[in-house]
Amino acid sequence: MAGWQPASVVSVRDETARAKTFRLALPQPTGHRAGQHYVVRLTAPDGYTAQRSYSVASAPDGTNELELTVERLDDGEVSSFLHDVVVVGDDLDVRGPIGGWFVWDGDTPALLIAGGSGVVPVMAMLRLARRLGRSELLRVVVSVRAPEDLYYADELPGPETTILYTRRAPEGFARAVGRLAAADIGKRPDSGATVYVCGSNGFADAATDVVQSLGVTTDQIRVERFGPTG
């Protein structure tokens, strides 16, 4: 993991009404793995600093650029600043990549289960699989409240992906609204597969219970819990 380094904002795009993706250019190749995160630090003129961790949404590609998707929290020091103040051309201090547990390197079968903003590191894994032409290694299940809450709506859908809605679904959507169930996963993952679960504490616990009900063993499961990151 490198120390603090400057990162230039090269693009900003909306994912939802409350989430933006920031594409950053670093001085050197990122060297990150799918599933890792970076810390963003803000420094005020009086020297006060605030820092938060954000998962990388982009797949490793050998370049010096990466994408962070940030949900805006109304009382969040860093997320509010990123959403309301930061524009293309600004510089941010970042540190990373960080994390070696919740990572996927694109060469083993995996079941990816994400709730809400927990889809961010899962998207990095899915993008990596598609870039390598290895989508058959993945099964992806993403749970959101409603269509307007879905990150990467134009890119996420695909033959390896199941999207479910817990409160309101698009008109004509085949699955009834409701929480993740064993039927959404289908057959039990192979014994050699790793299950990645990412979301809030409640979602992570519920999803873990679901996959274990299918016979998945504890040592196959890797969990990343997402709390409010302001």
What are these regions (language model features)?
Residues 1-88, 136, 144-146, 166-168:
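Ferredoxin-reductase
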Residues 71-230:
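FNR/FR-type flavoprotein reductase catalytic core
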